Curated annotation (Swiss-Prot):
Name by which UniProt lists this protein: Chromosome partition protein MukF
Gene it is expressed from: mukF
SUPFAM superfamilies linked: MukF C-terminal domain-like, Winged helix' DNA-binding domain
NCBIfam families assigned to the protein according to its UniProt record, in alphabetical order: PRK05260.1
GO molecular-function terms, A-Z: calcium ion binding
Length: 443
């Protein structure tokens, strides 16, 4: 098998060198090729006239909002470019002068198939592919148990595994890679929604998160249902290769198929675990953003009520209740002591209260400088500078402390003007804040 592969590589390099491939597909050219491929699939003879290609190019040109004046010239350039790059074949003769016929080349079919068909990945398609694989491996295992010479093994075992099962495994693997790319695109969409107006984006974000989670779980359930059976069939064939040194190429193929199947199976669970972590991160960000915005709006309304007291008087009712004793805190402390026991001083961690006290003290010292020098406080810049000093796990707690301390020092004059401040990024993890400059300090 290795010798065959070593002979194939030089031949493939020579073949590529002889044909002098030079592939370049900008977005409009790629769209033109995809439209040609889809239109070609609807034709019974698989042949395209130049007038058909010009009509298809006109549709692409309109979508890309290109000029209509030079349409024919640009269409001819695009057609010649696809022919030159061997995406299209042009046929003409002296009997059909001025009337050329075009066919999509195998290269054009392969490129368009990658962008069109591989995006049609679903649990139904995966089930059908795995069903075909199961039938092929079942027939190959039966043929392996019957046994025969090397020619028999090549025709009845090696051939179906190599040219059917392996290709389907490669197709599934490619589809999974497309799913990875799709997840990255969904993450970019969610980040874009949250950075603009997260009030309206929460529902859309939740829908994107749920749809992706459901798709991943459906695909993984389909893989789990068939994976063990396929592995057992491959082991069944492998057991028939014992003491058959002349069939080493079959054994190597079985090992490669087992590795591909393991990679396909592990992808699903890994993708689910990563997506669950991302889902939790987005929900934590949304909850924290809601809390911070709720406190800011409450403080703004309270200040407006106090300032407008004489024009719109109001009464303040207060109530005081005895604090309820929460036994759960004591119980949790006892359970923690029983589970952990006594630790050496070097291994003891600071309590959360001590850590917050240290942070509050440091933040107060930083913000007091602005008040003493009568400089306005840009919360976005201060948050970004301070958060860079702490790990990501503490960003939301530190941000809340900074906002609380800044509000205690003073207020923003623009808050009275009903002007919404712009969103400012405060870290490298898509968090942002919306606040005016604090330029009026309490004396």
């Amino acid at each position: 098998m290795q010798n065959e592969l070593a002979q194939t590589i030089p031949e493939l390099i020579s073949w590529t060198k002889e044909r002098e491939f030079s592939l370049s597909l900008p977005s409009d050219r790629l769209a033109f090729l995809l439209v040609i491929s889809i239109y070609n699939n609807e034709q019974t003879d698989g042949e395209l006239l130049e007038s058909d290609l010009i009509d298809l190019f006109r549709y692409v040109s309109n979508v890309f909002e290109q000029s209509e004046a030079s349409l024919l010239q640009r269409a001819n350039n695009a057609i010649n470019d696809l022919v030159k790059q061997r995406f299209l074949n042009r046929f003409s003769s002296e009997f059909t002068e001025g009337l050329a016929i075009y066919r999509v080349t195998p290269l054009g079919v392969g490129v368009s198939d990658y962008y069109v068909r591989q995006r049609e990945f679903s649990s139904l398609r995966l089930s059908i592919q795995l069903s075909i694989v199961a039938d092929e491996i079942q027939r190959a295992s039966v043929a392996a148990e019957q046994g025969g010479d090397e020619r028999y093994w090549r025709n009845n075992v090696f051939a179906p595994l190599k040219f059917s099962v392996a290709e389907i495994f490669d197709s599934i693997d490619l589809s999974q890679r497309m799913m990875d790319e799709n997840q990255h695109q969904i993450r970019e969409q969610i980040a874009g929604l949250l950075s603009q107006n997260w009030h309206e984006a929460i529902i859309n974000c939740q829908q994107l998160l749920d749809e992706t989670s459901i798709n991943l779980r459906e695909l993984q359930d389909t893989l789990n249902a068939a994976g063990d059976k396929l592995q057992s069939q491959l082991l069944r064939i492998q057991s028939c290769l014992i003491s058959r040194d002349d069939l080493a190429f079959v054994d190597q193929l079985i090992v490669n198929l087992q590795n591909k199947l393991d990679r396909i199976m592990s992808w699903g669970q890994q993708a689910i675990d990563l997506w669950i972590g991302y889902d939790k991160h987005v929900h934590k960000f949304i909850r924290t953003a809601i809390d911070m915005d709720k406190n800011r709006v409450f403080g703004q309304r309270l200040r407006q009520s106090i300032q407008n007291y004489f024009s719109s008087p109001w009464l303040l009712y207060t109530a005081k209740a005895e604090a309820l004793l929460d036994l759960r805190d004591d119980e949790a402390m006892l359970n923690e002591m029983e589970a952990v026991g006594e630790l050496p001083m070097a291994l003891e961690y600071e309590s959360l209260t001590d850590v917050q006290t240290q942070i509050v003290t440091a933040i107060q010292a930083e913000l007091a400088h602005f008040r003493d020098t009568a400089q306005p406080i840009n919360l976005g810049a201060v948050l970004r500078e301070q958060l860079a000093r702490y790990p990501q796990s503490r960003h939301f707690d530190v941000a809340r402390i900074i906002v609380d301390q800044a509000v205690k020092l003073g207020m923003a004059s623009q808050d009275h003007q009903a002007v919404y401040p712009v969103w400012q990024p405060i870290d490298d993890f898509s968090a942002a804040v919306q606040a005016h400059l604090i330029d009026q300090y309490d004396k």
